[in-house]
């Protein structure tokens, strides 16, 4: 039974909580602060890229010795790009999406009192929190933060003497990511067990909302892929500290040969990208699941092709494990092997196209309600399609030889993964904010936030494709130093202006978010007139979610505009009428 009189201390309620709803808020707020740090870093290095060598007081204020006289240091530039990428991919888009919305929605949408293990759920958050602090702390150590790129390729990540940032900063990066993986595994195992074992009466797998299917498949991807990253990190740490040579062979530093032979840095790339490409969908699938729910709810129509949507999630999840080497076409692999990975990569376009088609068909002739969540979900469909089209180009090994490690790649993955995932995250926050905090976000501020974000998002990353087609490599500190980049030099300030405006526009969201928590309009139980079980719980959080017996499910989650019923929505707990055919 749910309990409205459950007494807790401040520590047990807000710090070491085992309640899935509080843990979801802990993940979200931590991810927001990590996102602030990651976005600030991007602004700092975009100032350098847009106006090379110019002095900016803000750089000296925040960066200190790493920006003497307001000019960003070369090594600090590499550190910022490395930590920015790491924070945004793992700490914001992975933990911010899965940690927040899996925790919030899985028990509520399947009709469970809580997660299978509240204790493991608590541990999952605190491993993530400690990992976050450690990653940020690495910016403060002598020698600087890790600077080898977010992919930390050897030998720069193996040899402490290789470059500034390869010492203690890199060690902290490796330890932080190990803790992050532990957090991810604890959470993923909990999500899988909860979905399989704790569904309420009548909640068959074919009645699950698409959000739950997305979280379920994402958790499976995490359990299968993240341990491989830990294995790669363990071998790398052994190379760094124990004299092994898993990733080193015939290395010269300062003209002197190191006593390390027999290893291969390509081995690390295989291990990293075996996680790295499933990671793309660990980030994307929750966003797609959230958008499925938001689009159906605000179209007032059943989701088009429910079974095809589930099948496409499964197909994307499976294919994500057999495409990793498309990141490695230029490593000298056998051309036949390269063609195999070209084929498997192009196959992902099929289930991806199914999802895009079904989203558009759901919207077609629907009674559309343009809430901020709906706009961000439609924005996700836009970025998913446009970013996916450039992915088809990069999937061709012959084209990738030219475009590899250029701004074309940066533009591609920021649109298809970065913008799509962050749009899904924003859609989820706007849609379920009332369920998390009991108040409503300001809609007008939400509209302003969306239009500024999508305009600046495309303004930043669309021009990067042209810069990349001109041959501009990514991670260059000063592209104006090279004559062959002069044709696209004028685009860099434009990109930086959009990046700065887009970053500042997030202040609208931050104000709306924190103001609404304390001063927002009180929410009603089901503000969006949605069908799923979370909207049958009280606005005020209680332990066990429902005050009485657990709800019983009689129908699927997308019974919108059913002519048998007067309302244009039907809760899953509503019994079937005589003669009504259920799902």
What are these regions (language model features)?
Residues 1-583:
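Membrane-embedded and interfacial regions of multi-pass energy-transducing membrane proteins
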